[in-house]
Amino acid sequence: MEISLLQAFALGIIAFIAGLDMFNGLTHMHRPVVLGPLVGLVLGDLHTGILTGGTLELVWMGLAPLAGAQPPNVIIGTIVGTAFAITTGVKPDVAVGVAVPFAVAVQMGITFLFSVMSGVMSRCDLATNPRRI
């Protein structure tokens, strides 16, 4: 099965909304148990989406960002893992082997981005100082 451009766009919108939820709303739409069925619905295989989302939820159930430790990015991991399971027809436990490396790699990128942005924030604070004008 191939993913159409419209389906890829819909998955991107789902990832965007889930990312907003993860950092702002915390309605838990970013959890795999919710994202898996949504990906399955978009790709036309709700059953595999539910099974893969549930399996990935078991993998990431107890992970929480505490202090400086950041867990793998569950959003990208779930979307990539579920899409992989649906498009290739593999079992959900095989999708875990694909989802986890993607989740770790994306979280490393996000941590790097946040580290770079921390240096920019002091410059932004200086630029908004009204006495500087």
From Swiss-Prot:
- All disulfide bonds of the chain are none
Entry membrane topology: Multi-pass membrane protein
Q: Residue ranges, Periplasmic compartment?
A: 24-32, 87-93
Give compartment(s): Cell inner membrane
Q: Does the keyword Membrane apply?
A: yes
Membrane-crossing ranges are: 3-23, 33-53, 66-86, 94-114
Every PTS EIIC type-4 domain range: 1-133
Is DNA repair among this UniProt entry's keywords?
Answer: no
- Tell me the InterPro entries matching this sequence: PTS_IIC_man
Q: Name one GO cellular component term.
A: plasma membrane
Q: What is its main location?
A: membrane
Domain of life the protein comes from: Bacteria
Q: Which UniProt keywords apply?
A: Cell inner membrane, Cell membrane, Membrane, Phosphotransferase system, Sugar transport, Transmembrane, Transmembrane helix, Transport
Task: Write out the topological domains of type Cytoplasmic.
Answer: 1-2, 54-65, 115-133
Coiled coil, from the record: none
Might you name a Gene Ontology BP term for this protein?
phosphoenolpyruvate-dependent sugar phosphotransferase system
Kindly give the PROSITE patterns that the UniProt entry links to this protein. PTS_EIIC_TYPE_4
Question: Know anything about its domains from the record?
Answer: The EIIC domain forms the PTS system translocation channel and contains the specific substrate-binding site.
Q: What does this protein do?
A: The phosphoenolpyruvate-dependent sugar phosphotransferase system (PTS), a major carbohydrate active -transport system, catalyzes the phosphorylation of incoming sugar substrates concomitant with their translocation across the cell membrane. This system is involved in N-acetylgalactosamine transport.
* Name of the molecule in the record: Putative N-acetylgalactosamine permease IIC component 2
